Amino acid sequence: MSLEGKTVLVTGASGFVGTNLVNKLQSVDCELLTPSSSELDLTSEESVSKYFADKTPEVVLHIAGKVGGILANKTYPGEFFHKNAMMSVLVGHYAWLNGAEKVVSLAAGCGYPKHLQVPYREDQFWDGFPDENSYGYSLAKKNLIVQSWSYREQYGFDSTVLLPANLYGPHDNFDLESSHVVPALIRKFIEARDEGRDEVVVWGDGSASREFLFVDDTVEAILKMVDCNESGPFNLGTGVETSIKELIETIRSCVGYEGNIVWDTSKPNGQPRRFYDMSEFERAVGYIPSTPLSDGISKTVKWYEENRSVARI
């Protein structure tokens, strides 16, 4: 489906992925809807109902969500559950009710069971309880998948759900209390370098592994999925496993920090291992995202250093 001439709604347009997605869509001849939270409260049925009835978007790219790192998820699990559950249900329902042709949504890769053999396959997604550090967020986001399946079965409504790996890149949230691992570490190492600190303290022991996906690859995948007439969910990553220790060494190198790294083993590692089998995504779309971690980190460091005055910190 070409987006040319379509009315395209991007939820979460001012957020990390949303900002990058909107930047990409600026070159497409479509009517682009990017409402602020004051214009469209995605947790309010009254607000969502009215907005969709007034604007009748033909394509909905549902990127919005209440997101954060381990600390934020452990501190506010109820808030993470409520906001994400409401968004998950309302956006899909009112898109269908008002005649949208397609919805593409981002769910949560952390919804996979905590104890699972890697690489993760989509048919394992419901085989156990997710990691307890982010269960409120993870379980709320699973509503997107149930809704996609059930609305396709009953109404023939076309929506697709993606399970992104750990995302990073320009326009990310660099707030140390609410950010994810990559932006938090980039900020910590840059500040340590600039202030001449002898050491940087990081959580865990570095043994946990993750899969890191550059935001430009994420945007490309979302747009390609507009043409996929399947619910999924589909893993969205690179298929490459990276330990937190490797990640930190990459960030240290890109930043140019020469001090010591101190591991605070009293803090949780989170889920032990997580990376994806990307065969289903490749079957559906025909490629696998492939920006090397070192390239993506370098671009993110450069963006942050050039935009500290406007970055979310």
For the regions a protein language model found, what residue spans apply to each?
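NAD(P)H cofactor-binding loop motif with strongest signal on the N-terminal glycine-rich segment
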Residues: 13
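C-terminal substrate-binding subdomain of Rossmann-fold SDR/epimerase-dehydratase oxidoreductases
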Residues: 16, 20-24, 191-313
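Adenosine-cofactor binding site in Rossmann-like domains, unifying the SAM/SAH pocket
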Residues: 26, 30-50
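NAD(P)H-binding glycine-rich loop region in Rossmannoid oxidoreductase-like domains
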Residues: 45-85
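Conserved catalytic-site region of short-chain dehydrogenase/reductase
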Residues: 70, 105-121, 136-142, 154, ...
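Conserved Rossmann-fold NAD(P)-dependent oxidoreductase catalytic core, especially the SDR/UDP-sugar
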Residues: 89-134, 160
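Flexible, glycine-rich beta-alpha linker
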Residues: 111-113, 136, 160-182, 209
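Active-site Tyr-X1-5-Lys
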Residues: 132-165, 184-194
